[in-house]
Amino acid sequence: MVREKVTVSTRTLQWKCVESRADSKRLYYGRFILSPLIKGQADTIGIAMRRALLGEIEGTCITRAKSEKIPHEYSTIVGIEESVHEILMNLKEIVLRSNLYGTRNASICIRGPGYVTAQDIISPPSVETVDNTQHIANLTEPIDFCIELEIERNRGYRMKTPNNSQDGSYPIDAVFMPVRNANHSIHSYANGNEKQEILFLEIWTNGSLTPKEALHEASRNLIDLFIPFLHAQEENILLEDNQNGVTLPFFTFHDRLAKIRKNEKEIALKYIFIDQSELPPRTYNCLKRSNIHTLLDLFNNSQEDLMKIEDFRIEDVKQILGILQKHFTVDLPKNKF
């Protein structure tokens, strides 16, 4: 556990982590303050941040399991202690960390007797299990336990849709939210004749993100929501001129890619973050440690610069070049001029 004495600055508006602890592999806690704020600002920020933390952050989970040997979801299999339904519920609880796009395939194939746990999941390199000890099933006899899995990165909560499971495929309720809970509270105080506030924000996560990472992600998503207003003049979006009821453009990730092709590179690249690329966790962490967070940061480096990063290999550089070529049709220069 890390604790720091709370001190209030009357000069610059600052975030500060005042408490941080890991209660378990799947429960992290962080407590943050923002100060000094004028009266009313703390509640505005607190409500927006809580909503962003609980609803706007992407997470990764298992969304489907498939095995042709299973007749229906509520059946039991000889040699397995749990019913199929219980196994699906256990798979739902598996906490994963990834930076993948969309859906990927994974699998489990193990022979009993013995316990099947999260460490037995064979997943893509861009996906890692937070807690390898999470229980899936208990094989009581020497049987083969093989199932195919679908892993997806998304946000929010998705109920499984009815499925007759003719192909042995069973959807799983998906809880993509890495933040388990978030609360905010406000402390008011007087600074001379002026009333000011301190915002306290508490965050609990499932271990796939730390509270500090969740706070960063939520802040970034809130910023993204306001980008259209910042560039409204550039796009000639004037509400008073919208006489014909023309639908205003919706700014998406693909719109940002279009901006790159329209030579508005710097603005677009600044708001596309490297965790939106399909980089393996090790490569992503190396870039992050070198303060490379966005594509703009990445394009400010040459291949030679990347090779100077600690633990970086030529294979990592080639992988980055491949992703840039695939998604953006651009290359990094070999050397800085």
UniProtKB/Swiss-Prot annotation:
<dbReference type="GO" id="GO:0003677">
    <property type="term" value="F:DNA binding"/>
</dbReference>
<keyword id="KW-0804">Transcription</keyword>
<dbReference type="Pfam" id="PF03118">
    <property type="entry name" value="RNA_pol_A_CTD"/>
</dbReference>
<comment type="function">
    <text>DNA-dependent RNA polymerase catalyzes the transcription of DNA into RNA using the four ribonucleoside triphosphates as substrates.</text>
</comment>
<dbReference type="GO" id="GO:0000428">
    <property type="term" value="C:DNA-directed RNA polymerase complex"/>
</dbReference>
<dbReference type="GO" id="GO:0006351">
    <property type="term" value="P:DNA-templated transcription"/>
</dbReference>
<dbReference type="Pfam" id="PF01193">
    <property type="entry name" value="RNA_pol_L"/>
</dbReference>
<keyword id="KW-0548">Nucleotidyltransferase</keyword>
<feature type="region of interest" description="Alpha N-terminal domain (alpha-NTD)">
    <location>
        <begin position="1"/>
        <end position="233"/>
    </location>
</feature>
<dbReference type="InterPro" id="IPR036643">
    <property type="entry name" value="RNApol_insert_sf"/>
</dbReference>
<dbReference type="InterPro" id="IPR011773">
    <property type="entry name" value="DNA-dir_RpoA"/>
</dbReference>
<keyword id="KW-0808">Transferase</keyword>
<dbReference type="InterPro" id="IPR011260">
    <property type="entry name" value="RNAP_asu_C"/>
</dbReference>
<keyword id="KW-0150">Chloroplast</keyword>
<dbReference type="InterPro" id="IPR011262">
    <property type="entry name" value="DNA-dir_RNA_pol_insert"/>
</dbReference>
<dbReference type="InterPro" id="IPR011263">
    <property type="entry name" value="DNA-dir_RNA_pol_RpoA/D/Rpb3"/>
</dbReference>
<dbReference type="GO" id="GO:0046983">
    <property type="term" value="F:protein dimerization activity"/>
</dbReference>
<protein>
    <recommendedName>
        <fullName>DNA-directed RNA polymerase subunit alpha</fullName>
        <ecNumber>2.7.7.6</ecNumber>
    </recommendedName>
</protein>
<comment type="similarity">
    <text>Belongs to the RNA polymerase alpha chain family.</text>
</comment>
<dbReference type="GO" id="GO:0009507">
    <property type="term" value="C:chloroplast"/>
</dbReference>
<dbReference type="GO" id="GO:0005739">
    <property type="term" value="C:mitochondrion"/>
</dbReference>
<keyword id="KW-0240">DNA-directed RNA polymerase</keyword>
<feature type="region of interest" description="Alpha C-terminal domain (alpha-CTD)">
    <location>
        <begin position="267"/>
        <end position="337"/>
    </location>
</feature>
<keyword id="KW-0934">Plastid</keyword>
<comment type="subunit">
    <text>In plastids the minimal PEP RNA polymerase catalytic core is composed of four subunits: alpha, beta, beta', and beta''. When a (nuclear-encoded) sigma factor is associated with the core the holoenzyme is formed, which can initiate transcription.</text>
</comment>
<dbReference type="InterPro" id="IPR036603">
    <property type="entry name" value="RBP11-like"/>
</dbReference>
<dbReference type="Pfam" id="PF01000">
    <property type="entry name" value="RNA_pol_A_bac"/>
</dbReference>
<dbReference type="GO" id="GO:0003899">
    <property type="term" value="F:DNA-directed RNA polymerase activity"/>
</dbReference>
